[in-house]
Amino acid sequence: MEIQFGNQRCRMVNSGGFLATDGSHLKEMETDDVLVEFLNIEHQLFIRNIRAIVKIADTTVLPSASDKKLLYYVFDETRVRINDTPVIFSKLEEDNANVNEGSKMGVMTVPNTPQKPNLQQQKFEAINANEDQIDYSSNLEQNYNSLIRQGSDQVIPLSRFASEKSALELEKELFSERIPESQSAAEPVLKVENSENDLDEKLVLDGQHVEGDHSSDTEEEVVSEDQKQLNKTDDESTFIESHQIYIQGETKSPSSVSQSLSGDPSLKPAEVFDRKQSAEINSPIEKDVNPQQNISDSSIKNNSIHSDEVNPEVRPDLTPSNENEESKRSAPEIALKEKESTSQDESNREAEEAPISTNYSFPSSSLEDQPDKNVQSSAVENKNKHTNLVTSSFNLTKPMKSFIRRNGLRVQESVTDETDFVILGSPPLRRTHKFLLATSLGIPLVSSQYLTDCIKSGKVLDFRSYKYKDEEAEAKWGFRLDDIHRRTCFNGKRLYITKAIRDSMVGDSIHGLYSILETSGAEIVGDIKRAQEKDTIILAQPDNDQEGRNMSATGLNVYKIELVALSILRDRIDFDEFLIDYDADSPTKVIGKRNVSKASRTGQGRKRSSRSSWNKPSAKEQRT
């Protein structure tokens, strides 16, 4: 399978690989710069180990926690974007051969994913989710709930990462063709038009399930059906009224409902209220009504039998003015308002379910995606509620992870301005990337004993009382660990790094060096012409660095790479300490790209060979 990430293409092997930030590099070691990991199992593509913003179709997938990597199935011809960059998957001919070979051997089965769950389990859950909670007595109610049960047998609900078919959409597909095309003009329930939305609204408002094929109904049968609609039983009218009251957005207490239905002594107020509650829970109207449907107020008013008998004492907070406004509200407006509140609750739940250990920095979004002031203020409030920490040369144990999760602490992957403190491992101190970043930003350094004492006390202690100490490192490198402030020694400085240093750094070490210098306020120049400008600091290696030797021969000062780390620790640059003198290390001098010693240039000390010119006989001697 071939993957195109932006403008770059790369071929993925059978088992899969990693996609890194510096390009489409697959089948490499897993590092901090890996965006996603792809798995190619039996010609089916999966994504896991997500550290980027991934969108599969129109669904945003949350990043993966470090201890739990979910598989997300990518359907064929599905739009996938990683960090807002489109990704295109192309199948190759050898993929089909590998699939046939793997199917013969039976080596692997496709695992279950949040988007491709166990079908039997999901079907069982779908049936249980729509089970009747009340034993309905009327045939009309049983027909309406059988409609929902029949719909649940036809659809397999997916997870919240994928879109689901609603019960109302299922009714459109199953029963829209069975509704008679010709309706009586004297029908008192709803004026039926040719659109599918109005037909579905009639099904929901009437609460009826039209059975059989009525495409060839006669006019007499339609009139008889309308007459049957006018002569409904009391139970059927009660069930329909409960739905009509909910659709119009009116809220009734059990007493008001019982007063409006006082003509039927067989129904108690508690039973009517329970049926209304069950109708609100099981009815698909709340989430599936299309807000774009154009339903006239007159049709809803005709549909409601007892809408004019609502007791005004039930809503004492309504004045006569806003009572009229409340009665004019239509079902689409109520559904749209409830849909907005539901979507807001879902977005808050997704933010709470984000993995704790995932704090990966991504490219800045466009202006259209910038949050408004309210979202920014809420983000600041969330930041104040949590304490962010980073560990360096120290591994968290399971009790520590559970304590951090319970007490609102957050573990970041890298050091940022939002980091509150950094936990270091036991001495000796190591000059790691996170340690140097924390020192440059002025972030406190804390001993690993801090978390141990927090677990013993059962609460979050003050980390300022657990300062990290290593006197040997302080004496060796000439700095103080308790000197916590933002470093400014590299502000406005330009640095050039030779190719020998860049090639010697493995993996992401060179990117870590760049991030440390940029955080400290330095500028990295890559042009050798700019390296020859005044006040440019040139970093090179003392040995095996021809570029550094040539620059030193032209009169430029060249320094060791240790200048960066120790200058950040001390907050000053000691140029003389890190200056490289190639002439003192070796007697050779640089001429172009060749090392020519003084003896080789003067010819002194050269051994005469037997083939020297004075050892050869002259031509006259050879003739004699």
From Swiss-Prot:
Keyword Cell inner membrane attached: no
Subcellular compartments: Nucleus; Chromosome; Cytoplasm, Cytoskeleton, Spindle
Biased composition (Basic and acidic residues): 200-217, 225-235, 306-316, 325-352
Top-level taxon in the UniProt lineage: Eukaryota
Disruption phenotype: Strongly resistant to the microtubule depolymerizing drug thiabendazole (TBZ). No effect on DNA damage sensitivity in response to ionizing radiation (IR), ultraviolet (UV), hydroxyurea (HU) or camptothecin (CPT) compared to wild-type.
GO cellular component terms attached to this protein's record: cytoplasm; mitotic spindle midzone; nucleus; site of double-strand break
Membrane spanning residue stretches: none
Keywords: Cell cycle, Chromosome, Cytoplasm, Cytoskeleton, DNA damage, Nucleus, Phosphoprotein
InterPro entries for this protein: BRCT_dom, BRCT_dom_sf, DDR_Transcriptional_Reg
Quaternary structure annotation from Swiss-Prot or TrEMBL: Homodimer. Interacts (via BRCT domain) with hta1 peptide containing the S/T-Q motif in vitro; this interaction requires phosphorylation of the hta1 peptide at the S/T-Q motif.
Function: Involved in DNA damage response (DDR) mediated through its interaction with phosphorylated H2A proteins hta1 and hta2 which mark the discrete foci of DNA damage.
Database matches in PANTHER family: PAX TRANSCRIPTION ACTIVATION DOMAIN INTERACTING PROTEIN (PTHR23196), PAX-INTERACTING PROTEIN 1 (PTHR23196:SF1)
The protein, known as: DNA damage response protein Mdb1
Source organism (scientific name): Schizosaccharomyces pombe (strain 972 / ATCC 24843) (Fission yeast)
